Each structure stands twice: as structure tokens, then as C-alpha cells.
Swiss-Prot record:
Function: With CysD forms the ATP sulfurylase (ATPS) that catalyzes the adenylation of sulfate producing adenosine 5'-phosphosulfate (APS) and diphosphate, the first enzymatic step in sulfur assimilation pathway. APS synthesis involves the formation of a high-energy phosphoric-sulfuric acid anhydride bond driven by GTP hydrolysis by CysN coupled to ATP hydrolysis by CysD.
Protein name: Sulfate adenylyltransferase subunit 1
Gene Ontology MF terms: ATP binding; GTP binding; GTPase activity; guanosine tetraphosphate binding; sulfate adenylyltransferase (ATP) activity
Residues annotated for GTP binding in this entry: 33-40, 112-116, 167-170
Pfam families for this protein: GTP-eEF1A_C (PF22594), GTP_EFTU (PF00009), GTP_EFTU_D2 (PF03144)
Catalytic activity: sulfate + ATP + H(+) = adenosine 5'-phosphosulfate + diphosphate
G3: annotated span: 112-115
Class of the enzyme per the UniProt entry, highest EC level: transferase
Organism, as annotated: Tolumonas auensis (strain DSM 9187 / NBRC 110442 / TA 4)
Residue ranges of the region described as G5: 204-206
Domain tr-type G: 24-240
InterPro entries associated with the record: CysN_GTP-bd, CysN_II, CysN_NoDQ_III, EFTu-like_2, G_TR_CS, GTP-eEF1A_C, P-loop_NTPase, Small_GTP-bd
A single GO BP: sulfate assimilation
Pathway: Sulfur metabolism; hydrogen sulfide biosynthesis; sulfite from sulfate: step 1/3
């Protein structure tokens, strides 16, 4: 057992310790930046210095640092985070690694994201649930393309708190001029991003300088150490203040006397007696009960998985939305969205894709690519396609009406994934900017031969369960 946890349990008792842990605020943050900027080392050092590393892990770390470490005689703290064999062999991060730690003040979930450009899609996945981003910059190399790319994607995904950690200051002798130059360059770039709270701190992740306490080696730095910034960062409560929204994940029908609608509350608070509207149908009813495994609730908050029963029998199925009558959720078949493209084959207009928005799955196609965004300069360029890791603003038409919110309003009902219809692989991630009126996705066009061949297959080989493409 971790010695810090053991001491706390001994002092408080197990029940009080668990109760105190339960009521601590939780901050989700990610580390991002270019390859070899020290993201995994930073997290490993934070875990170590906050006394969250178990004794057996520490012994393994000493052993692994001698065998495959990249830091000479010093402990390679990145090995605490990089778990894949390929990551350890190459000294890089590939997948998104999640780690948990806590301090007396707050709990934290960290997403350690990869720095290599080909893993940008993994970074976008890690950023999608975070409240804060730590942008790592190597003091020797300054602001690089991936630094800008990750900053832009984090901003695009709604993160409005950045801590810019200028790492490896020990390799530039903790030179204040180097720090000031990097700070100036980054803030000039970030001026083109949406309004963001940005703090800059000089650190040495390997040696632990300015992580938990202020370093004597940077007397010219008057700000807080990194961990204090994390403890004092604002935790998003915006969804709590919004009107209620919940995507229906499943209709629960265990017997003839019960019909409930299961899902996770995306925004707002709901109580028995509240009026809710069903989208896209627009029908209204009152909440009868809020059911959970542990019994009925008096109210449900964002993030809670519940089953809601209604006073009236209404046709509701998976993918529908339950919302408060005053929610500004739009029902549409046409959206404007920012999209991060995640596959080698370029995104092309007019090609049919599967679209999954919250719990609703539908089909659609790209009507137009309004522009592609240069992540280095934030300039907008004309484009006819999006390549791997490129970001663009697109108009999409859907075959079915869906309820959507702008991503900056509600993440869960404003984000979607694009799925390849043949391979079923996720190939893009989208953030809704706004609902557009007037267009719907038309039927897919097939030649006469394709229609006849499809009919022949369905007639003579019904066990293949081929779709009727004339209805697509």
C-alpha cells in the first residue's frame, strides 16, 4: 500500500478516509506537446513527488531505469506511465495513458497523450473529456508545430485553461531570457485562439523543479509551482447550470408494468415532476421517477447514469433526447462542424458515412468543406478534401433529424464521430458549431445494374442479410 494512504487511513479511519476522498473535487487534465518534450516524465514525477507511487512500483522503476531508461543514472519517471512494450522500447508515448492521483486538496485524472504527429487522433481523444491542458515545451527547441497543433485541438475541444510548462530548463541553465522568449512566442500564437486562461511556468520535470514547491534555481519566477496551479484550477460546473439534457441509451422494459428510459445526464438537473420534451418528436411529458440500482433519486446531476420513467406513454427509442422545454437544443438534418480527420484515406465531399452523435446513429455526407485550418498560423485555406490529422470546417447533411447543441454549449450533445461504412472504423471526430436549416441528405445514388444485382442477391441469398440499397 502507498505509505501516504496508509498514514491517512491510520489517522482518520477507513470510513472517514473514503468519505473525504469522495467529496474532493476532481480535475481532469491532459499533458500534450511535441515528442520528447517530457510529458510522461512530468506525470511520473508528479506521481512520485505527491507520494502516489507504491513501493513495488518504485523498485520496478529503479530496475527498469537501469535496463531501458533514457535518463542516464537518474530515475526515468516516464516508465511509470508508458506501459506498452513499444513505448518503452522507443522511449515514446503511443496510446493515451490515464493515471489517477490525489493531494489533500483535490483528486486528479491525467491523460498522457502522444506527441508524434501520426498519433494526433489519440491526443484528440484524450482531450475530449478534460478541463485543463498542460502544454509542454522543450526549453531548447521552443514552440514547435505539434505544440501549436495540440494547443489548437485542445482549444477546439473546449478546454479554456492552459498551463504552459517550459520544460528542461536545467539544460539551458535556468536562463530567464530563454523562458521569456518562449513565453512571448507562445502567447503571440495563442492570441488567435478563443479566450483562454493561460499560465506559464518554468520547470525541470526530471529533477522536480517548480513542480511541487518553488525552485531556488529560478528566483526570477514569482508564480506558483505547477501542482498548486492544478489544485487551484477551476473545475467545470457549466453543465450544471444549463437546462436538462439526456440522450436515451436504452429503453428498459423488464416487465409489463415498467417502461424506463436509460441514459447519462449530459447537462442540467432533473427532478420528479419536471416537464421534459422528447426530441426529435417534440412531445412532452412529466418525469415520474428517477430510478437507479440503489433506489429512486430526488434529482439527477450531469454525469449520473439513471433510468427515467414518464407519466405518459410516448414513443421513445434509443438515440432520442430528453430535454427541458427551455433547452435550446435544435432539431436538424444539417450541421456546421469542425472535424479532425483520423485516417489515411482523405475525407471527400458527397461520400456516405455513418455518423454517431451521442446515442443516435445515422448516415450522412459532407456537402462542402468551407475551409481547412493551418494549425501553425491558424489561417484558413480552401480545400476539397481533408487528409490525416487535418482539421476543417464542414457542412454535413444527415438522413435523419437529430437533436444537437453547439459543442461549446454541451459537449455530449454537440460532438459526433464519423464511421467508415465498410470497415466500421472511426475515421473522424466532429464538434458542432451550429445547426443549419434547409438541407437534408438525399438518397444515395446507385446505377440500375447495382439495384438489380442487389435485388438478385437478396432474393437468392437471404442468409447474407444484404441491405436493400434502394431504400438507402
Amino acid at each position: 500500500m502507498n505509505s501516504t494512504i496508509a498514514e491517512a487511513i491510520k489517522e482518520e479511519g477507513i470510513e472517514n478516509y473514503l468519505k473525504n476522498q469522495q467529496h474532493k473535487s476532481l480535475l481532469r487534465f491532459l499533458t500534450c506537446g511535441s515528442v520528447d518534450d517530457g510529458k510522461s516524465t512530468l506525470i511520473g514525477r508528479l506521481l512520485h513527488d505527491s507520494r502516489q507511487v507504491y513501493e513495488d512500483q518504485l523498485k520496478t522503476l529503479h530496475s527498469d531505469s537501469q535496463k531501458i531508461g533514457t535518463t542516464g543514472e537518474k530515475l526515468d519517471f516516464a516508465l511509470l506511465v508508458d506501459g506498452l512494450q513499444a513505448e518503452r522500447e522507443q522511449g515514446i508515448t503511443i496510446d493515451v495513458a490515464y493515471r489517477y492521483f490525489s493531494t489533500p486538496k483535490r483528486k486528479f485524472i491525467i491523460a498522457d497523450t502522444p506527441g508524434h504527429e501520426q498519433y494526433t487522433r489519440n491526443m484528440a481523444t484524450g482531450a475530449s473529456t478534460c478541463d485543463l491542458a498542460i502544454i509542454l515545451i522543450d526549453a531548447r527547441r521552443g514552440v514547435l508545430e505539434q505544440t501549436r497543433r495540440h494547443s489548437f485541438i485542445a482549444s477546439l475541444l473546449g478546454i479554456r485553461q492552459f498551463i504552459v510548462a517550459v520544460n528542461k530548463m536545467d539544460l539551458v541553465n535556468f536562463d530567464e531570457k530563454v523562458f521569456d522568449s518562449i513565453k512571448k512566442e507562445y502567447l503571440e500564437f495563442a492570441s488567435g485562439l478563443p479566450k483562454t486562461d493561460i499560465r506559464v511556468v518554468p520547470i525541470s520535470a526530471l529533477d522536480g523543479e517548480n513542480l511541487v514547491v518553488n525552485s531556488e534555481l529560478t528566483p526570477w519566477y514569482q508564480g506558483e509551482p505547477l501542482l498548486t496551479m492544478l489544485e487551484n484550477a477551476e473545475v467545470g460546473t457549466r453543465d450544471l447550470d444549463l437546462p436538462f439534457r439526456m440522450p436515451v441509451q436504452l429503453v428498459s422494459r423488464p416487465n409489463l408494468d415498467f417502461r424506463g428510459y436509460m441514459g447519462t445526464v449530459a447537462a442540467g438537473v432533473v427532478k420528479p415532476g419536471d416537464v421534459v420534451k422528447v426530441l426529435p418528436s417534440g412531445k412532452e411529458s412529466k418525469v415520474k421517477r428517477i430510478v437507479t440500482f440503489d433506489g429512486d433519486l430526488d434529482y439527477a446531476l450531469p454525469g449520473e447514469a439513471v433510468t427515467i420513467t414518464l407519466e405518459d406513454e410516448i414513443d421513445i427509442s434509443r438515440g432520442d433526447l430528453l430535454v427541458a422545454p427551455d433547452a435550446e437544443t435544435q432539431v436538424t438534418q444539417h450541421v456546421l462542424a469542425n472535424v479532425v480527420w483520423m485516417t489515411e484515406e482523405p475525407l471527400q465531399a458527397n461520400r456516405q458515412y455513418d455518423i454517431k452523435l451521442a446515442t443516435r446513429k445515422t448516415r450522412g455526407h459532407v456537402d462542402a468543406i468551407r475551409h481547412r485550418i493551418d494549425v501553425n498560423t491558424l489561417e484558413k485555406h480552401d480545400a476539397t478534401e481533408l487528409k490525416l490529422n487535418e482539421i476543417g470546417l464542414l457542412e454535413l447533411s444527415l438522413t435523419n433529424a437529430v437533436g444537437v447543441d453547439p459543442y461549446n454549449t454541451v459537449r455530449d450533445t454537440g460532438s459526433f464521430i464519423i464511421i467508415d461504412r465498410l470497415s466500421n472504423v472511426t475515421i473522424g471526430a466532429g464538434m458542432v458549431v451550429e445547426a443549419l436549416a434547409g438541407k437534408t441528405a438525399g438518397k444515395a445514388e446507385f446505377s440500375e445494374f447495382e439495384l438489380e444485382f442487389n435485388a438478385l442477391v437478396r432474393k437468392h441469398f437471404p442468409h447474407w442479410q444484404a441491405l436493400d440499397i434502394s431504400k438507402l
